[in-house]
Amino acid sequence: MLSVKIELLEALHQALEKLSPGAGSKAVFESPKVAAHGDLATTAAMQLAKPLKLNPRQLAENLRAELLVRAPFERWVEAIDIAGPGFINIKLKPEAKQQTVREVLSQGQQFGSQPGTGKRMLVEFVSANPTGPLHVGHGRQAALGDAICNLYQTQGWAVYREFYYNDAGVQIGTLASSTQLRARGFKPGDPEWPSGENAAAYNGDYIADIAADYLAKKTVHSDDRAFTASGDVEALDDIRLFAVAYLRHEQDLDLKAFAVHFDNYYLESSLYLSGKVDDVVKRLHDAGKTYEHDGALWLKSTEYGDDKDRVMRKGDGSYTYFVPDVAYHISKWERGFEKVVNIQGTDHHGTIARVRAGLQAANVGIPKGYPDYVLHTMVRVVRGGEEVKISKRAGSYVTLRDLIEWTSKDAVRFFLLSRKPDTEYTFDVDLAVAKNNDNPVYYVQYAHARICSVLAAWREKEGGDVASLGQADLSPLQSPQALALLLLLAKYPEMLTAAAAGFAPHDVTFYLRELAACYHSYYDAERILVDDDLIKRARLALVAATAQVLHNGLAVLGVSAPQKM
């Protein structure tokens, strides 16, 4: 129906131009809030009434008369009604809605996607410190980041996925010292092990695993490097390098199991080694954007919207963490990414203003509001009716690997994407493995498998060819259930566009659940494999199109579309 809507919108623009030159391009179609009011609606008359000094309802009547004589409206529109102060509601003919089936079947996996724009976008997500296993919060971030990448790819963007490793901070030193203690035979609870509220140590069993492999002089491979342990318990730098490589490898395995890949791994340490951090500080100093106070170097970030000036270099000569962040984002800009999105936890909210202030102060041509941020809350895990807080492997939290092993990759992805990122979420493990309609991922996947079963039965019994359904006569698709399904299929491309613009993959989950429910209602109302060949082929074409859209939407989420369940 997208082609039909384009025709109708062009006719609307032409009619508005006739009534008020220059007004046409501003008009859009909306979906009526009440389905009974029609299939499309526009408020163009009410928007134009004031500048034209006309009664909005009378203007709507004039516009209605103009539309009724235009060819696209004569061909595709059944009725145009005026409601309230000047709402224009449009009811489409069944033939208009039926066009969606042809569009879906002809475009296949490309249905809903836009042609390439040439625009480049970088999405940075997960970016976990290599100090422990990925936790459930990282899982939510991985699902969000990957789905947002997929959404923007449907909109024609060239999307680049990047993982930023904070491998130059204090936590890496704690990782090294904890591994060294384990290698020396100590464990949490021993007098030699750091204890207390602010103890600098990692207590999870994974530290013992790292130490054992280090003593065994093993070689570990991470995404872009390999490191062989020396086994020397006194060589703290060797222990640090091995532990980081070990955990990067473990994180790589978790991400692979979650079907998330990255185009690049960017190391924080490279910003120091390349001189990019020093270059940023010099640029800001030379531009007069810094000052000395109490032995520290400060950025005049309040000049750029921050609530207070920020320390860049502490009295001991070390940089605060936001300085390499500014250098990193300048690197993103210099690599040609006009749009950058950072997926981070809500605990990073305070960094947004200072990073953007630093980028503006650097004066390298970066626009205000760069980069975009999507902030998410943490995830609470419930199993057997009780909250799960601790993993033996991690020592203090539930890992992403735990969740995948308890349920499945598909369930974890769908569940973690089913709410707005900034909404608190409880992951119910028992629900995620349930094979019933209460489980949303099962419900959607079952709808797809159910259609595949119908198509398979048709192929087996009659030698049917799904490819031939694109030429089916669709005129039998007249029932309320069929028309509702057709209209919902037609909304898929617009839903994708809106979800991408709002960084809202949860909208895709809502749509898929609604589509699955609509299909199940249709299936219950009309038998597909009837004796009448004309009716049968029309209904098969409709359900084949539905399966394709379910498949496409699940792919955006990184969830499989099984043919059997």
Curated annotation (Swiss-Prot):
Provide the gene name from the record: argS
Q: Name one matching Pfam family.
A: Arg_tRNA_synt_N
SUBUNIT field: Monomer.
Cellular component aspect of the GO annotation: cytoplasm
Tell me which UniProt keywords the record has, alphabetically: Aminoacyl-tRNA synthetase, ATP-binding, Cytoplasm, Ligase, Nucleotide-binding, Protein biosynthesis
- Give the matching InterPro entries: aa-tRNA-synth_I_CS, Arg-tRNA-ligase, Arg-tRNA-synth_N, Arg-tRNA-synth_N_sf, ArgRS_core, DALR_anticod-bd, Rossmann-like_a/b/a_fold, tRNAsynth_Ia_anticodon-bd
Motif residue range(s): 'HIGH' region:
128-138
To which protein family does this belong? Answer: Belongs to the class-I aminoacyl-tRNA synthetase family.
Superkingdom of origin organism? Bacteria
- Do the record's keywords include Disulfide bond? no
Say which species the protein is native to. Answer: Albidiferax ferrireducens (strain ATCC BAA-621 / DSM 15236 / T118) (Rhodoferax ferrireducens)
Q: Name one GO biological process term.
A: arginyl-tRNA aminoacylation
What name is this protein filed under? Arginine--tRNA ligase
